[in-house]
């Protein structure tokens, strides 16, 4: 089943708010919408989407400034905040005419964006599968100890050099949170959107500055609190793909996720970018989840 380093599907492009955004859109029927986070792209789902072939319209979008989507110009520290990403993604999903039986498959910042969208469009959501997600606002004590100093540095002036010049999120954080070594071809695919030093890498710095930690940024904390409260009560069917050992959805956040109603849980091997360690297990679980939601 594995495609290895080969991308799944063919990239399509659409103009959103004056910028060109990239997405994959394969198959027909009700959509299964796969959304990546930082610093990845739709490429993250290449070995998972094939498991869902024939179960619906398979869509994976590249966030603005990431993957093959356009960069924002002018760029700077104020760009690529959560609210700006949400504006672009909302408009893209609206343009894709998703209908009212959407299954969301979300990870990392794709989870925050997806959970937020689902709360605001709950009547259109058939189910939510999530993994290594931003399920609620957190404190620094909840953050993985081995990564805490680095992520605190990202939120300081030091982050500018670490990310914009040294490309630390792609070169260090990404491979460091995958259990297996990535091939040169796989690393090349992840590097490609961020080869140029400077503002081209801004999305990968803005994202860690948006994590709702210790009350900041206030707008993202409020959004995460709202969707966390909703998910903890919503009857919408859920699939929690737990990671062992995991990185983000661990400890207090994992315990909170396990309280959500109408939820199935499986566990797969992986740290944070678990799609690179357990794609077949993840793909099979998502396919089984969709089949239960959409019996023939």
UniProtKB/Swiss-Prot annotation:
<protein>
    <recommendedName>
        <fullName>Haloalkane dehalogenase</fullName>
        <ecNumber>3.8.1.5</ecNumber>
    </recommendedName>
</protein>
<feature type="active site" description="Nucleophile">
    <location>
        <position position="108"/>
    </location>
</feature>
<keyword id="KW-0378">Hydrolase</keyword>
<dbReference type="InterPro" id="IPR023594">
    <property type="entry name" value="Haloalkane_dehalogenase_2"/>
</dbReference>
<feature type="binding site">
    <location>
        <position position="109"/>
    </location>
    <ligand>
        <name>chloride</name>
    </ligand>
</feature>
<feature type="active site" description="Proton acceptor">
    <location>
        <position position="272"/>
    </location>
</feature>
<dbReference type="GO" id="GO:0042597">
    <property type="term" value="C:periplasmic space"/>
</dbReference>
<feature type="binding site">
    <location>
        <position position="38"/>
    </location>
    <ligand>
        <name>chloride</name>
    </ligand>
</feature>
<dbReference type="GO" id="GO:0009636">
    <property type="term" value="P:response to toxic substance"/>
</dbReference>
<feature type="active site" description="Proton donor">
    <location>
        <position position="132"/>
    </location>
</feature>
<keyword id="KW-0216">Detoxification</keyword>
<comment type="similarity">
    <text>Belongs to the haloalkane dehalogenase family. Type 2 subfamily.</text>
</comment>
<dbReference type="InterPro" id="IPR000639">
    <property type="entry name" value="Epox_hydrolase-like"/>
</dbReference>
<dbReference type="InterPro" id="IPR029058">
    <property type="entry name" value="AB_hydrolase_fold"/>
</dbReference>
<dbReference type="InterPro" id="IPR000073">
    <property type="entry name" value="AB_hydrolase_1"/>
</dbReference>
<keyword id="KW-0574">Periplasm</keyword>
<feature type="domain" description="AB hydrolase-1">
    <location>
        <begin position="31"/>
        <end position="155"/>
    </location>
</feature>
<dbReference type="Pfam" id="PF00561">
    <property type="entry name" value="Abhydrolase_1"/>
</dbReference>
<dbReference type="GO" id="GO:0018786">
    <property type="term" value="F:haloalkane dehalogenase activity"/>
</dbReference>
<comment type="subunit">
    <text>Monomer.</text>
</comment>
<comment type="pathway">
    <text>Xenobiotic degradation; gamma-hexachlorocyclohexane degradation.</text>
</comment>
<comment type="function">
    <text>Catalyzes hydrolytic cleavage of carbon-halogen bonds in halogenated aliphatic compounds, leading to the formation of the corresponding primary alcohols, halide ions and protons. Has a broad substrate specificity since not only monochloroalkanes (C3 to C10) but also dichloroalkanes (&gt; C3), bromoalkanes, and chlorinated aliphatic alcohols are good substrates. Shows almost no activity with 1,2-dichloroethane, but very high activity with the brominated analog.</text>
</comment>
């Amino acid at each position: 089943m594995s495609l290895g380093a080969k991308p799944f599907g063919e990239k399509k492009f659409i103009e959103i708010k004056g910028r060109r955004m990239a997405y994959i859109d394969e198959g027909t029927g009700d959509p299964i919408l796969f959304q990546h986070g930082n610093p990845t792209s739709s490429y993250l789902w290449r070995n998972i989407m094939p498991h869902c072939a024939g179960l619906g319209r398979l869509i994976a979008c590249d966030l603005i400034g990431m993957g093959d989507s356009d960069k924002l110009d002018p760029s700077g520290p104020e760009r690529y905040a959560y609210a700006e990403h949400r504006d672009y993604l909302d408009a893209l999903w609206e343009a894709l005419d998703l209908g009212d039986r959407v299954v969301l498959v979300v990870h990392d910042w794709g989870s925050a964006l997806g959970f937020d969208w689902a709360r605001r469009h709950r009547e259109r959501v058939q189910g939510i599968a999530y993994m290594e997600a931003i399920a609620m606002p957190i404190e620094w004590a909840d953050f993985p100890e081995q990564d805490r100093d680095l992520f605190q540095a990202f939120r300081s002036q030091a982050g500018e050099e670490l990310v914009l010049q040294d490309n630390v999120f792609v070169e260090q954080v990404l491979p460091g949170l995958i259990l297996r070594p990535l091939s040169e071809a796989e690393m090349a695919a992840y590097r490609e959107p961020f080869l140029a030093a400077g503002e081209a890498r801004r999305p990968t710095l803005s994202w860690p500055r948006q994590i709702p930690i210790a009350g900041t940024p206030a707008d993202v904390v409020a959004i995460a609190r709202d969707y966390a409260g909703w998910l903890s009560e919503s009857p919408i069917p859920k699939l929690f793909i737990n990671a062992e050992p995991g990185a983000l959805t661990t400890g207090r956040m994992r315990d909170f996720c396990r309280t959500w109603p109408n939820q199935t849980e499986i566990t797969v091997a992986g740290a944070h970018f678990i799609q690179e360690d357990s794609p077949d297990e993840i793909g099979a679980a998502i396919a089984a989840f969709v089949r239960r939601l959409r019996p023939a």
